[in-house]
Amino acid sequence: MTFISQTKEADVVFIGGGIMSATLGAMIRQIQPDWSVVVFEQLNELGQESSGPWNNAGTGHSALCELNYTPAAKDGSVEASKALAINEQFQLSRQFWSHMVDKQFIGSPKNFINTVPHMSFVMGKDHTDFLRTRYEALKPNPLFSSMEFSSDPSQIEKWAPLVMKGRSGNGPVAATRAAEGTDVDFGQLTKELVGYLGNNDAEINYGTTVTDIQRGTDKRWHLKLKHKASGEHGAIKARFVFIGSGGGALHLLQRSGIPQGKGYGGFPVSGQFFRCTNEEIAAQHSAKVYGQASVGAPPMSVPHLDTRYVGGKKSLLFGPYAGFSTNFLKSGSLWDLPLSIRPSNIYPMAAAGLHNLGLTKYLVSEVLKTRSSKVTAMQEYFPQADGNDWELITAGQRVQIMKKDRKQGGILQFGTEVITSSDGSIGALLGASPGASTAVPIMLELLQRCFPREFKLQWQDQLKDMIPTLGTKLNDNAELAAATMARTAATLQLD
């Protein structure tokens, strides 16, 4: 009996069975149904790394509550452009998911997306002034028109009782609330999308690692494979390869040898969350409440108290608490970081490290935190929290991008970046948040860069069938924005 794939050649090979590969695969299956598709996942189940429901916070990132997307300028004003762009991107994802549900390509939307209001909550005069300014900057925009603001503790308590009950002191507080926020189980969504692929002639392989990738003289990518359990080796050739293996993408990008991948490094950041599955406590909270990151802390460290829906059950999550590990994946190796160092990236990585000593200091302080101090931090947002009701869980690894920079030599970049070869035969995704929430626009960008001719001349009708407002900014058209959000809300059964 053989365990390794016997397929010798494919039009498209996906490395990694997470939300990015699943999204791109579902798109390609509809715009180019004649292409052969093969997926390789190194674990025995899909979406078990960063896409897994407990490896991320499940926030449908649309900049409704994430304060780091709206930085304050020196004059006190708020820059809203990034928030608008992220919300536009999330609307594209909602449209694609809605299309997949409407066509019955995937199952009930309740399995992967639920309405959970998004809130921002701040304390102290400076922060409440900032939040009001942010609200005033966002509210006039069609994509944020439903947002509410309050500095009345009694109103905030109605929105989020656990945040206000037992709160001591008379200092000012403020909150915004967007009722249309969502909680997304990206692990389940990944399984739904890959299930659609498998039902439509794609070959899905589990427990298989891609150990090497090289460009052949036949202009095909030659991949070496290893089945982890049996130890069997194999090989496959592909016309197009997408490296969507999360933190594992950097190593394979480096092995591909494409010039566009040189100079990139990875900075792994681990994290933990508190999880509460006590139904009585979970029933008292229905929101994702985001605060502000501590001074010197990275954007992904913003504290938040979240309602989660996983496997049909409601629970609560608080965090994150940052940490450091040299693994690039939860299932990876402590050698991941040192083995990623190359002559082409050692200087950018060193320069980025020197420019981010504050981040290093922050991570060290987080690693040294006791469980008791972590509970105390949670009580800033849930004053009556009892640590005995909460379980500390390890989140997925986040590998932030380090890259060349003309001025500083190297920078640490938060967010995601698409890397493609000059001929469009291979693409990879590096980085993290907002990540999964914007998988659809990210994969659209990759399609446009790797297949510019087909994207422009052949695929527009199919793409607009999936995403009707593709190429249009919803925020510039209030009527279209309202209609689109109402349509996708109905299809996705969002209350």
UniProtKB/Swiss-Prot annotation:
From the UniProt record, give the pathway where this protein acts: Carbohydrate metabolism; tricarboxylic acid cycle; oxaloacetate from (S)-malate (quinone route): step 1/1
Q: Does the keyword Flavoprotein apply?
A: yes
Kindly state which keywords UniProt assigns to this record, in alphabetical order. FAD, Flavoprotein, Oxidoreductase, Tricarboxylic acid cycle
Q: A Gene Ontology MF term for this entry?
A: 2-hydroxyglutarate dehydrogenase activity
InterPro entries in the record: FAD/NAD-bd_sf, MQO
Query: What are the required cofactors?
Result: FAD
A GO BP entry is: tricarboxylic acid cycle
Q: What is its EC number?
A: 1.1.5.4
Catalysed reaction per UniProt?
(S)-malate + a quinone = a quinol + oxaloacetate
Q: Does the keyword Membrane apply?
A: no
Q: Which family does it belong to?
A: Belongs to the MQO family.
Which NCBIfam families does the protein's record reference?
Answer: mal_quin_oxido, PRK05257.1-1, PRK05257.1-4, PRK05257.2-1, PRK05257.2-5, PRK05257.3-1, PRK05257.3-2, PRK13339.1
Instruction: Please identify the protein, giving its name as recorded.
Output: Probable malate:quinone oxidoreductase
